Amino acid sequence: MILHAQAKHGKPGLPWLVFLHGFSGDCHEWQEVGEAFADYSRLYVDLPGHGGSAAISVDGFDDVTDLLRKTLVSYNILDFWLVGYSLGGRVAMMAACQGLAGLCGVIVEGGHPGLQNAEQRAERQRSDRQWAQRFCTEPLTAVFADWYQQPVFASLNDDQRRELVALRSNNNGATLAAMLEATSLAVQPDLRANLSARTFAFYYLCGERDSKFRALAAELAADCHVIPRAGHNAHRENPAGVIASLAQILRF
């Protein structure tokens, strides 16, 4: 079994760019940014429980890494960068730390490196279980209306929230809930030490209005790019700013 994805082919000799979306997104999420890099072959992946991979269930990050590895092999992708937002960034960091043949580097936008104590994990597990229950039992428009009121999305205006609620409500609530719990921060290890000892290139992007993830970025041994005029979802709020940062990274 492999993950559903959309592949766009560029010039031979350059590494692939493999894009991983955030929670409740899909393979279209990164395309406005990714299509600015037409010289590179691009793979836009649907993570388990999302989009064309909605029917694929996983028990945890090991399963996601295994599926990602098999998907890369199926497309004969030998050299690549992982580019991930939020959940996709956490998947990218986990997979990279577990080891992926051909990995050139990881570019993470607003991805959490992991909670650092049992109390934080227990609180996150309670929270994610409550959200998962709502995703399973309530209309998605109502759930996402509350989801986007969370502090991490404070930089969004009302129009942006309405647009995101309408877009995300096309998902399957049950499969979102399953993926939310399988890849919860409550079950993700703290990756800070692994990332410090990494053998791959590692870059971190965060919006200038995203104070939580700017603080997290400062804890990581990564080259950090702050995206102007953006909050947590920087590639959506300022795609040109993210394109500029990716172009700078990929020139090295």
Swiss-Prot record:
One of its GO terms (biological process) is menaquinone biosynthetic process. This is 2-succinyl-6-hydroxy-2,4-cyclohexadiene-1-carboxylate synthase. Catalyzes a proton abstraction reaction that results in 2,5-elimination of pyruvate from 2-succinyl-5-enolpyruvyl-6-hydroxy-3-cyclohexene-1-carboxylate (SEPHCHC) and the formation of 2-succinyl-6-hydroxy-2,4-cyclohexadiene-1-carboxylate (SHCHC). Belongs to the AB hydrolase superfamily. MenH family. The keyword Ribonucleoprotein does not apply. Monomer. PANTHER family: 2-SUCCINYL-5-ENOLPYRUVYL-6-HYDROXY-3-CYCLOHEXENE-1-CARBOXYLATE SYNTHASE, PROTEIN PHYLLO, CHLOROPLASTIC. Keywords: Lyase, Menaquinone biosynthesis. It comes from Escherichia coli (strain SE11). It catalyses: 5-enolpyruvoyl-6-hydroxy-2-succinyl-cyclohex-3-ene-1-carboxylate = (1R,6R)-6-hydroxy-2-succinyl-cyclohexa-2,4-diene-1-carboxylate + pyruvate. Its EC number is 4.2.99.20. One of its GO terms (molecular function) is 2-succinyl-6-hydroxy-2,4-cyclohexadiene-1-carboxylate synthase activity. Pathway: Quinol/quinone metabolism; 1,4-dihydroxy-2-naphthoate biosynthesis; 1,4-dihydroxy-2-naphthoate from chorismate: step 3/7; Quinol/quinone metabolism; menaquinone biosynthesis. The keyword NAD does not apply. InterPro entries: AB_hydrolase_1, AB_hydrolase_fold, SHCHC_synthase_MenH.
